[in-house]
Amino acid sequence: MSKQNKQPLLQRPAVVGVLASLLSIVVGLVLGFVLLVLLNPGAAVGGMRAMLATGFSSMDKLGKVLYQAAPLMMCGLSVGFAFKTGLFNIGASGQYTMGAFFSLLCAIQFQLPWYVCLLAAAIGGAIWGIFPGLFKAYFNVNEVITSIMFNWIGMYLVNLLLANMPNMLASGWGASNSDRTAALNVANPGAILPRGPFAALFGNSSWINISIIITIIFAILVWVILQKTTFGYELKACGLSRDAAQYAGINSKRNIVLSMVISGALSGIGGGIYYLAGTGQYVLEKSILGMGFNGIPVALLASSNPIGTIFSALFISYIQVGGAAMQPAYSSETIDIVIAVIIYLAAFALLMRGVIAKAVSGRKEKGGAAK
């Protein structure tokens, strides 16, 4: 019998990780409920019930959960991949924005099909990820600082480019709006992600498309790269100890840059699949898109595990869809605060790991003393 099999169940890393995530979710929900009670005691139970039940109340709502989970999952994979390689990619929002721009550029300006647009989204995100990687690898500049800067640079650059490309804007396709890109169903229906098998299952009213399948495939692919390949081992080795990796003959500078490029590409795909759904238009922004930042709690809740990211993204999407059903008992601002509390407290999985480990070790010591 292997050593892994002899190890007590509650001491196995995989089991502890799952328990930590579940405990974090419970704590987040409890504190969210307390906040609802403080704000409107009479509606707290009904509000929490609506939040937890709405996602399964109809096929349309379930489809919306899956639709919103797809870009969240890609951003979570992006942040989690960087975490696994010892980097903190807080620039996922900028990479997401560049991915959205590249995909829409191919869709509207060049009239290309959806799969080419999605590839362009990955390239856009990768390009925006390479700069923080280069600064980190060759000048040892903290990637948090550079990636935050590139979030803002990316947003304003996209605004500038779109403002000077009339054919990209809705006003260039007969609409009155000049502050957003053209609707894909007007400009290029062939660039909209197909609905595949979901059309018959969820009906025409649902927004769901094959993006959820694409993101699950990417999650599995990232897991295989990190866990089953030499390349993934080298990336993680650089993250654990750059000096030790160099001593072992691993090119740490190259791997740091590649880590940020891959992480950026994943965020870029997230931006691509969101806007290629055909349900929204990119609006010239005055603040950074929040989707990239939402990838951080997705990754933390999953302990940066690519497979766990699938479930954490689904949970966060489910809470967001359910939160909309809490009106009119609660204002939209209140709902946003409650959802934020639940999501960010649910991301304390690492802290909960320590709590579980301490509880298990304490029980083990008591058992040993009793003997």
Residue ranges of each PLM-predicted region?
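Membrane-interfacial amphipathic/re-entrant helices at transmembrane-helix boundaries
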Residues: 2-74
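Cytosolic-side transmembrane-helix boundaries in multi-pass membrane proteins
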Residues: 1-25, 240, 247, 251-254, ...
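Short loop segments and helix-boundary regions at transmembrane helix junctions
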Residues: 7-19, 83-91, 110, 122-188, ...
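Helix-loop-helix "hairpin" substructures at the membrane interface of multi-pass membrane proteins
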Residues: 127, 194, 202-281, 306-307, ...
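Transmembrane alpha-helical segments in multi-pass inner-membrane proteins
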Residues: 261-340
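Transmembrane helix-bundle core of multi-pass membrane transporters
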Residues: 54, 59, 151-226, 334, ...
